[in-house]
Amino acid sequence: MLFKISPCFIIASSVLHFTFTAFIYLTKEYRERLSEMIEERGQKISLGASENTKRFFYNGILLTALGISMRTVSLFFNAFITRTIGAEGVGLYTVVNTVYGFSVTFATAGISLTVTRLVASARGEGREESVPRILSGAILYALCFSTVAALVLYFGAGSFAAAVLDDIRAASSLRILAPSLVPLSLISVFSGYFIGIKKVARNAITQVIGQSFKICATVWLCHNAAPLGVEKSAMMLSLGTTVTEIVCFIVIFFEFLLERRGARGGRGADIVSVAKVAAPLGISAYIRQALLTIEHIIIPKRLRVYGSSHGEALSAYGTLHGMALPMILYPMVTLSSFSGLLVPEFAERESADDKAGMRRLAERAFATTLVYAVLSAALLFVFSEELGYVVYKSRDAGTYIAALASVVPIMYLDHVTDSVLKGIGEQVYSMWVNITDSLLSIFLVWLLIPKMGIMGYAVCIIAMEAYNFTLSLIRLCKRIRFRIPMLASVVFPAASALVSGFLVKRLFISAGRETSPLWLALEIIFALCVFAGSYRGVMLIYDGARIKIKKHSASY
């Protein structure tokens, strides 16, 4: 029985998602208020861990729960959109987003991370009074760049569509997206502030409201616009995005006012400090996004050289980039939650010159990431065919998921490495790595796609992730001396994942196109249980052997 995704199902999922995350948010807010009341009376809550560690894991768990909820709803939402407007419609909206993505980068590049880093450093050094000046400078910086980006995108939409995208149907969507850039840049400022003060619950509720609103509005718009053609469908997707950003800005600004009420600090705007950090990040992002835009523009063109028609090229590109890649990135939501919190943690330790603390945190982060990434890669590869059929009803999507599964460990590790480098102030180095990465990507896309088709793009993704991670890791190892237990973090997880995958394929009968969501869920749960049991068993044996060896060595 095929899995049919209806508009009512999507809207109901978004409502459940909103309720679930609001509950987590309110629970965390209650806990924080209770802690503040107790501390005011001269008491302390002690749970056997430092306050920073507890806050880090509280925030990480909150963001993980939020991220999984959002990504799950988003996955089914994207599947609904794909089935409603078709692969060609997804392809058109994807190429529209290449130009829009560059505009977003120009409007917001580096500002969220800049605010996070400056606010975290100021708090770590006891300079709370400088936070208002940092925020004022960041707001001015964001307004200048976002206003310019919005005007250029709106008035240049026709030229971008005709000359750059080679599809005049994209012009209307670009004009609709232009007004979203100003609120989006201001959201980045306030989001960075809340991460910097380690109150990510504020960001969580904003994201929940925004995505719930976007899903409900876009489902309604696309459901009515789909019969009108590909162009109208892309326009409705764009309209949903613009209105959502405006709603999100209103919500997060209201939360900011509540957070800062009664706060005092120096007047004026410290735009110089903001620009010093944001400029290198911005330049890196501008150049990389420009190169990324070029890359995504030439992909459909090189596919036509391979022999595909315009519609076939957009469909193939939409399947790989709009279906397979989101599935590959789905498990990374957990890592993204914690890796985003690593930036202020490393920034504070860097300011305090706590090298031992940075080393311990890096070792924990990389060891955990490796175990999780190896498991994710194995599950994506083993269930690639079923995921393609169940979520997207597409055999090609399953093929691309299997092809990209091999790069998952490198991709996830690179994500964590990048966050650590930004936390210790290595954003300029990351800038040059990202620029060379993008240049090589364009070269490989130009070279491989006419020979291999869309699989050439998959090969390009794998090669460039490996390149980026290698250079980033070399730099990080020069700054922080840390070690990773390869047996416990790579060999044992890989062996356990292979065992779980082998047993699942042996014990469960593959239904191919007829696989149901419930059957797939049971397979994945079974595989996770086998992995957990086998990995835990291997680790117990390994730890026991190490203890015996140490005792034996000590006896001599």
Question: Where would I find each of the regions flagged by the language model?
Answer:
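Helix-loop junctions and terminal segments of transmembrane helices
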Residues: A109-G124, I328-D353, R359-A362, F366
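Interhelical loop/hinge segments that connect adjacent transmembrane helices in multipass membrane
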Residues: E36-N52, V230-S238, F253-Y286, D353-A356, ...
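Short runs within selected transmembrane alpha-helices of multi-pass transporters and secretion channels
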Residues: M70, N78, A109-T116, I176-I195, ...
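Transmembrane alpha-helical segments of multi-pass transport proteins
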Residues: S233, S284-A285, A488-R546, Y556
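N-terminal membrane topogenesis motif
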Residues: L2, S6-V73, E129, R133, ...
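Transmembrane helical elements of multi-pass membrane transporters/channels
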Residues: N59-S74, G240-I252, F256, G268-P344
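Alpha-helical transmembrane segments of multi-pass membrane transport and lipid-handling proteins
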Residues: S136-A163, W220, R359-I410, I442-F443
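Signature of the first transmembrane helix
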Residues: I38-E39, R55-T116, Y141-L143, A150, ...
